């Protein structure tokens, strides 16, 4: 709506007259057609949200959830620098994410694919009191996508290289080190 002042005169009103202009397509409204056909047609290629991993770690307590690799409070990682991780839980917005961990001076624990902060058998990879020194993630049934992940170990502020799939793992299995931070990302193949 646009308002302006006219210098013209209107009978019965002294001085300038304020007029309101409203840009409405009244002929279309009168004919019953209020929008164009283009406006009624949905977009041909709506943008789908990018797939994301959601994950948490247990360091004596469950830390906050990281989702989509962009939690501003954690710079996109789960963990606390120089504090060991004992458990990991993770899920993906597409496909099925399975994962497992290696415990220091121990072995690879079984694969899990649930997402839980209470089920240490099906929804958490890890074991209470057992420090994690290696992790593996695998994304199943997600055509065109895979999981990429990396870890940081105690004694360094840097991350180890990114790992894709299960041909390798993130961490260092040597009996001395432990993982203190992880990052997980769902990416196109």
Q: What is each model feature region?
A:
Residues 40-189:
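Lectin-type carbohydrate-recognition ectodomains
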Residues 1-43:
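Functionally critical loop-and-helix segments that line ligand-binding/catalytic clefts
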